[in-house]
Amino acid sequence: GQLNYFVGRDFYNSKMKYKNPPIPKDVIGFDLYINWDEPIVLCEGVFDAIAIKRNAIPMFGKTIPKKLFKKIIEKNVKKVFLMLDEDAKSDSIKITENLINFGIDVIYIAMEDGDPSDLGYERSLELIKSSREITFKELIGHKLNGKTKRYMEI
């Protein structure tokens, strides 16, 4: 195959942990390994997806690439788990709203203890298993309040 994307990672605890190339991010990471008939997990980075292991797709940032969004709709995905970093809550709400508008069940997972690559597979799996779907009422409430609140108890 051909290289379609890469990312660098700093292991010396600098402020910027990851470095993405200055190219378009309209790539679907691990596309060949995704079972589109099963629930998918959307996360920010490649290392997050690797830590989650099963049906995880890196978005290469805090927003969902158009190509990925289109494929989720075309493949008629029924359920999406959203595991974005703590600093991406407002982006999570936008993604959730867009997916709900297409009839997709969204389960937002509050990542208050770090990102999936920090937590590892076991803890990420625990969070997925203990999560619940966001209701339309909760989404509207958030938008009206203009505040981010947790949608699940951990």
Model regions: which residues?
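Extracytoplasmic/secreted cell-surface and envelope-processing proteins
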Residues: A51, S90-S92
